[in-house]
Amino acid sequence: MMGKETPSLRPVELPIQPVGFQDRYKVIHKICEALEKVAYPRVKLAKFAVSLELKLAKESKTSQLYRFNVGILLRDIVKFKANVYKLKIANKPLVPQKVNGRSHTAPITTKQEVFTRLRELLIDKETLRKNGYILPDVKYEPQQPVSSHVTCVRCGTKFSKEDIMNSVVCKFHPSKKLYDKSTKLEIYPCCGESTSSVSFLRLGCSTQKHHVYKGETYSELCTIANFLTTDLIDGKENVLALDCEMGFTTMGYEMVRLTIVDFFTSKTLYDEIIRPIGEVIDLNTQFSGVREEDILYAKDYEDVMEDVLRADMINRNSILIGHGLENDLNVMRLFHTRILDTAIMYSVGRFKNSLKNLSFEILSRKIQLGEHDSSQDAIAAMDIIKAKNGISITQTDW
């Protein structure tokens, strides 16, 4: 038994969980006990236990199946002395079997092999459209009337855009609700309240002085700036990971930071704070890391787009990588269709896994522990694709 509480022994949140948090928490401790019995290295024990339980939770569709798989795993940890090549979860090998000392998926070591593989993974336009991407080959009507009334994306109150700077009480939950399959309740991770709670916190655990909104349709997005396209920008094929931080203004949802990372060298090619077009309401500093003093002398939207839309950066042949990249391209007001979106590629059924969870599950890397770092997020999405496709994460000389 582990002598004292280990802060890292917490289950990773999932959109749908086979059992409740407490049950998953107890299982992690049982796995730790089993690993200790076979003298598993203590320095790696906590991380390994959490990753094993996460795989159990993802592979088990019901609470009964979860408990069955837990029993098998605990037995096998002791039986095989935690040999990862012999352990199975839901009858699937923990580590893929190898042939002649190499895994079934041969590692990709040349630039040409990388391009070939990534081209095969490009998401088709219909899938992009279904996932909220604004596409250039769809006829939109920017002159279509845009409503003067919008719904607050935080509290759900309908309000007039003209009143956006009026002081109000906007109560909301900063975290998205998660469904707990064992209790059949929707829980807000930010405060632990459920949607069926009678507590006053049910309406929200955070308060702001202004309502805020996001433009969703092409017409609404064009009220800030018209869309640009990469179609006319010729250049060599390249692969770029991209991430934007966004803030709320009087004109909606705007880009306040843009980071671009090169796939092959992992170097940050561009990282700029951006002065939004509308008057700032909330820069989402808690998540974006951008503060009001940062934007005083920052570049404006037009200058930034002029910087990045060029032959040697974002061009018509670029493969862009990100997580939920439709949000980034929408705030950039950019048409582009050569996309690798980890939120789509590695979703669980109709539920999209968070970048934070994917990063921990696939890379054993913890991100977004405090203020979001757009370079960290861009690199995480890029490395997930590398790890899933036999491309070295550490190789920088191609």
Swiss-Prot record:
Q: Which SUPFAM superfamilies match?
A: Ribonuclease H-like
Gene Ontology BP terms? exonucleolytic trimming to generate mature 3'-end of 5.8S rRNA from tricistronic rRNA transcript (SSU-rRNA, 5.8S rRNA, LSU-rRNA); regulatory ncRNA 3'-end processing; U5 snRNA 3'-end processing
This protein's record includes keyword Nuclease: yes
Protein keywords: Cytoplasm, Exonuclease, Hydrolase, Nuclease, Nucleus, rRNA processing
| Keyword Nucleus carried by entry | yes
Cellular compartments annotated: Cytoplasm; Nucleus
Q: What is its EC number?
A: 3.1.-.-
This protein's GO cellular component annotations are:
cytoplasm; nucleus
Concerning InterPro entries, the annotation shows:
Exonuclease_RNaseT/DNA_pol3 (IPR013520), REX1-like_exo (IPR034922), REXO1/3/4-like (IPR047021), RNaseH-like_sf (IPR012337), RNaseH_sf (IPR036397)
Q: Where is the Exonuclease domain?
A: 239-385
Q: Which domain of life is it from?
A: Eukaryota
Report the top EC class in one word. Answer: hydrolase
Molecular function terms from GO: 3'-5'-RNA exonuclease activity; nucleic acid binding
Regarding protein family, the annotation reads: Belongs to the REXO1/REXO3 family.
What is this protein's function?
3' to 5' exoribonuclease required for proper 3' end maturation of MRP RNA and of the U5L snRNA.
Q: What is this protein called?
A: RNA exonuclease 3
Lineage, opening ranks: Eukaryota, Fungi, Dikarya, Ascomycota, Saccharomycotina
What gene does this protein come from? REX3
